[in-house]
């Protein structure tokens, strides 16, 4: 019913707004990208905004993210991040619950177009080298 995200692009390259981005970051935590690329489209279909998730049935939301594992931890992070997101000023992503350095670096790169970021994540490094700085 839901098409997975493309394998040849990073999750961050296939989402359209910062809340979706933060959801993707939380889903990617300790989870393979392939599983997230399958689960994220369905999750965003049912919960396209922070408010939609905050008003959703908890068990239904958990059933969608269940294939990713750590269901209770992940669900609680998504809820707390969504609560923070409603009053977030859009600057420092690490102020959102559950968003650490990886999420902050990713947000800087994909949404703020700040390519001076020095990520420690290998995929973000590779993206900057190959897609932004054209280093082979």
List each language-model region with its residue ranges:
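N-terminal polyanion-binding entry modules of DNA glycosylases/AP lyases
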Residues: 1-90
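Catalytic DNA-binding helix-loop module of base-excision-repair DNA glycosylases/AP lyases
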Residues: 20-27, 78-132
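Short, mixed-charge aromatic SLiMs
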Residues: 45-55, 101-103, 130-131, 135
